[in-house]
Amino acid sequence: MLEDYYPSTTSYYHSGIDDDLYTAKWGMVMTFLDLNDSSLTPFEGTHFALIGFKSDKGVYINNGRVGAVESPAAIRTQLAKFPWHLGNQVMVYDVGNIDGPNRSLEQLQNSLSKAIKRMCDLNLKPIVLGGGHETAYGHYLGLRQSLSSSDDLAVINMDAHFDLRPYDQTGPNSGTGFRQMFDDAVADKRLFKYFVLGIQEHNNNLFLFDFVAKSKGIQFLTGQDIYQMGHQKVCRAIDRFLEGQERVYLTIDMDCFSVGAAPGVSAIQSLGVDPNLAVLVLQHIAASGKLVGFDVVEVSPPHDIDNHTANLAATFIFYLVQIMAQHN
């Protein structure tokens, strides 16, 4: 039995007015799945599993605005409204949430990793609804556990922050996940391949830039780089990063986008990547056929305005699933 795991029991979705797939919405098509069901066998074809990570403990430790614990429900509600374009050949299963208000951050990350591995063993592509960006380390661990020790796993993070902070004194938090991944790779004598899109210089100290400069395998583009380059040059940079890689894990921190597009986040951003450009870049990553899982994190519904941020997060999920279904 998976720890801290709660299958969905309350529907966030609606039945709609008919059963015609040409007019169906996500909320009419998505079905519940219990990962603890021992009778399940690996699925054939390309299918997805949606799981919520109900934790913003890392945000609290990092002195951010808490509220991301409420985001899985908010994103599900927005996603349910979107039209379904994938017929009956592709399924998106809602498998529930990882939740443990009295559990430690490390325990919840470990529980998420085991749920992710279970999804991968069932041949389901994980989609995680954070939660703070501490979500990423648990997701990454689960993906790595589903691979052999020699398999590669590159990481792309769309984020205004590197999230490479040391954690020896403070302990893990929402800003340390990728340093934890880096340290794991060093311990295993692997190269940690990490590409951050949307870095803002005013959100990252000199220590972090120096760490990146000295670390082979880590690349980044600032938000201003992306603005000047345009999506085609950004996509070419991603292609170079992924050359020779077989698998990539993608994580989207909603503070990558300006407060006008994403007001409901843990750390608001005055500047940010254009969401339209982001969709083109995300579609390109998905079209590589290398994407094995992704998450959307740091949506904070108590600070949102008319569900703008939750809707944008759901929009990214919509377009990623559309393309992944065609290229996996």
Swiss-Prot record:
<comment type="function">
    <text>Catalyzes the conversion of N-formimidoyl-L-glutamate to L-glutamate and formamide.</text>
</comment>
<dbReference type="GO" id="GO:0019556">
    <property type="term" value="P:L-histidine catabolic process to glutamate and formamide"/>
</dbReference>
<dbReference type="InterPro" id="IPR006035">
    <property type="entry name" value="Ureohydrolase"/>
</dbReference>
<dbReference type="Pfam" id="PF00491">
    <property type="entry name" value="Arginase"/>
</dbReference>
<keyword id="KW-0464">Manganese</keyword>
<comment type="pathway">
    <text>Amino-acid degradation; L-histidine degradation into L-glutamate; L-glutamate from N-formimidoyl-L-glutamate (hydrolase route): step 1/1.</text>
</comment>
<feature type="binding site">
    <location>
        <position position="255"/>
    </location>
    <ligand>
        <name>Mn(2+) 2</name>
    </ligand>
</feature>
<keyword id="KW-0369">Histidine metabolism</keyword>
<comment type="similarity">
    <text>Belongs to the arginase family.</text>
</comment>
<dbReference type="GO" id="GO:0030145">
    <property type="term" value="F:manganese ion binding"/>
</dbReference>
<keyword id="KW-0479">Metal-binding</keyword>
<dbReference type="GO" id="GO:0008783">
    <property type="term" value="F:agmatinase activity"/>
</dbReference>
<dbReference type="GO" id="GO:0019557">
    <property type="term" value="P:L-histidine catabolic process to glutamate and formate"/>
</dbReference>
<feature type="binding site">
    <location>
        <position position="161"/>
    </location>
    <ligand>
        <name>Mn(2+) 2</name>
    </ligand>
</feature>
<dbReference type="GO" id="GO:0050415">
    <property type="term" value="F:formimidoylglutamase activity"/>
</dbReference>
<protein>
    <recommendedName>
        <fullName>Formimidoylglutamase</fullName>
        <ecNumber>3.5.3.8</ecNumber>
    </recommendedName>
</protein>
<feature type="binding site">
    <location>
        <position position="159"/>
    </location>
    <ligand>
        <name>Mn(2+) 2</name>
    </ligand>
</feature>
<feature type="binding site">
    <location>
        <position position="159"/>
    </location>
    <ligand>
        <name>Mn(2+) 1</name>
    </ligand>
</feature>
<feature type="binding site">
    <location>
        <position position="253"/>
    </location>
    <ligand>
        <name>Mn(2+) 2</name>
    </ligand>
</feature>
<dbReference type="InterPro" id="IPR023696">
    <property type="entry name" value="Ureohydrolase_dom_sf"/>
</dbReference>
<dbReference type="InterPro" id="IPR005923">
    <property type="entry name" value="HutG"/>
</dbReference>
<feature type="binding site">
    <location>
        <position position="163"/>
    </location>
    <ligand>
        <name>Mn(2+) 1</name>
    </ligand>
</feature>
<dbReference type="GO" id="GO:0033389">
    <property type="term" value="P:putrescine biosynthetic process from arginine, via agmatine"/>
</dbReference>
<feature type="binding site">
    <location>
        <position position="253"/>
    </location>
    <ligand>
        <name>Mn(2+) 1</name>
    </ligand>
</feature>
<feature type="binding site">
    <location>
        <position position="133"/>
    </location>
    <ligand>
        <name>Mn(2+) 1</name>
    </ligand>
</feature>
<keyword id="KW-0378">Hydrolase</keyword>
